[in-house]
């Protein structure tokens, strides 16, 4: 079953709604082999990011407001909701919600 997600692509920059079905789709959408999760303070949403983004030459990233996450996250970010049992659920946030949480795009040197 496909799950609604929000994809942030700092290279375009663009925020879009996507559908994912499992970890292979997450890997494909954020363009990595190994990803990690950043839990949002609402306890309901999780951002999937490239676990090696800061060491593999990724040039651009996203800086959220400090209450979401204090450091810039490298590369594309995929946001899903948590079903409370270790699985994914439809993201309840909108593109506008996400835009309000993003401080800007950063370049890593």
Regions found by a protein language model. Give the residues of each.
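Domain-length accessory/inserted modules outside core catalytic folds
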Residues: 1-109
